């Protein structure tokens, strides 16, 4: 267990270390404080909490196929099944690289009420915000999305500097992806079974079969 925790710390550090110097340090960092309590990372969901069928999406914010799913399939899925209360849709972030983790930190920074709106903007603007090889440019691009969502720079800088939360996010991702046998993105858990990327018609057939049971 101790070895696993050390590995998680190293992975989170590797993904966040490049943020040092890219966002201003917060005042909280200069003082001493008691050890923080364990950080619980929750999954965000849309749709009825009473729905009998849950669809879980695993996606990376830097994955082109994930962006395509959100542009081409997700709107119809949302209109037909999520907004109507037929299913509960849960989004789980996947961190293959530092940019994907940083995007998730910005999305979560807005809280539950803003989360999915920020997710939509991150995917819609993926080719723009993630195109640069300069990490500072990527951070500024993500903060621009955050500003559009109503966040100020001080709030976002504090979120981006939260290494303990980044570590907890990575641990949450690894635990879920291992439990579900994740192989790539986007992937979907429907009725407890993991599926790879698919068309709307393919997803509709799987969901309808679950609803009919």
Question: Model regions: which residues?
Answer:
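Extracytoplasmic thiol/disulfide redox context detector
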Residues: 2-97, 170-174, 212-213
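Glycine-rich, flexible loop/turn motifs
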Residues: 42, 102, 156
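C-terminal cap of thioredoxin/glutaredoxin-like
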Residues: 2-12, 28, 60, 144-213
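Structural alpha/beta surface segment adjacent to cysteine/selenocysteine redox centers
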Residues: 61, 67-147
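A short alpha-helix capping/helix-coil boundary motif
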Residues: 56-58, 120-123, 151-154
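Extracellular/periplasmic catalytic domains that process cell-envelope and extracellular macromolecules
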Residues: 49, 82-84, 114, 180-183
């Amino acid at each position: 267990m101790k070895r696993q925790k050390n590995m998680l710390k190293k992975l989170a550090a590797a993904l966040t270390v490049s943020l040092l110097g890219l966002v201003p340090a917060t005042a909280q960092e200069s003082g001493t404080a008691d050890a923080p309590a364990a950080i619980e990372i929750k999954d965000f969901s849309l749709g009825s909490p009473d729905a009998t069928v849950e669809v879980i999406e695993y996606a990376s914010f830097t994955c082109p196929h994930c962006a395509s799913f959100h542009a081409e399939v997700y709107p119809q899925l949302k209109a037909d099944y999520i907004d109507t209360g037929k299913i509960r849709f849960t989004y789980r972030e996947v961190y293959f690289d530092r940019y994907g983790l940083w995007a998730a930190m910005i999305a979560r920074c807005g809280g539950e009420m803003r989360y999915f709106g920020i997710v939509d903007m991150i995917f819609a603007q993926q080719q723009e915000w993630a195109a640069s090889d300069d990490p500072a440019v990527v951070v500024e691009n993500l903060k621009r999305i955050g500003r559009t969502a109503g966040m100020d720079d001080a709030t976002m800088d504090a979120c981006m500097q939260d290494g303990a939360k980044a570590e907890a996010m990575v641990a949450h991702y690894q635990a879920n992806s291992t439990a579900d046998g994740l192989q790539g993105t986007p992937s979907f858990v429907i009725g407890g079974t993991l599926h790879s990327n698919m068309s709307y018609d393919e997803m509709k057939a799987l969901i309808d079969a679950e609803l009919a049971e």
